[in-house]
Amino acid sequence: QRQMCIRDRIEACAKEWGLGNINKATIIDPEDHPKKEEYAQLLCELRKKKGMTIEEARKLVVDPLYLGCLIIKNGDADGQLAGARNTTGNVLRPALQIIKTSPGITCVSGAMLLLTHAPEYGKNGILVMGDVAVTPVPDAEQLAQIAVCTARTAQAVAGLDPKVAMLSFSTKGSAKHEVVDKVVEALKIAKEMAPDIAIDGELQADAALVPEVGASKAPGSSIAGHANVLVVPSLEVGNISYKLVQRLGHADAVGPILQGIARPVNDLSRGCSIEDVYRMIAITANQAIAAKKNAE
């Protein structure tokens, strides 16, 4: 009865919006999932070192956020999109407990896809910025991971050949400060982590984006003046920057796109629009396709 009720509600909404292909969707009731006990056993096994009992696992497995991550962990789905009715913390917690971070990554972060009206920047006005969502004050190791993950996100969701700029208020030693030192150290680590990625720093934003300024401030840099991936030194900078671009530049900001998790899990704003949802569905699918290719 409950399953029919859920299906009826979804089908009624689909009819209202003129969606004729809802029959292609698998509609799941967490309370009545045929693999509920199997997933409870899996969760108990994954969390046994934390003292989880099978009774606790059975209670959690009916939570859609936990169930979704368990379905992914078991190989029965490729990604999850949630958050329209949940906090970021509630979305991330089961993802980190069950799916965990990607190999070699300890820092989860969030990228923003910026669709600007300035085709002279990035690739026809398309840029990706990180971190804008998760890690407030990353250290050099974390910042390097953010750079690599943001480059991979740019490849997966925007089809970009990433040209990564590590941003700062200094360009190539023009200013001295411990914050600049962190960016320089992060650049070194990122190059060691992913030698295949084109990356440079530290660069001021104008030096990263404007060819003439890049040539003047960082001669010889292949990234300066041509960056399409912008890595900021802190969450504070990232959050402020993308919102300024969005509001003052009338750019479309798509995201945040969570990165650093072993399989795609994305978090919607509780104020999300229908357009936000379908864009993030497409992005999550692209992340899943890229993850499968990388695993082959």
Regions found by a protein language model. Name each.
Residues 1-6:
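Short, small-residue-biased leader/transition segments that mark boundaries at the very start
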Residues 8-224, 229-296:
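Anion-binding alpha/beta catalytic cores of soluble intermediary-metabolism enzymes, centered on
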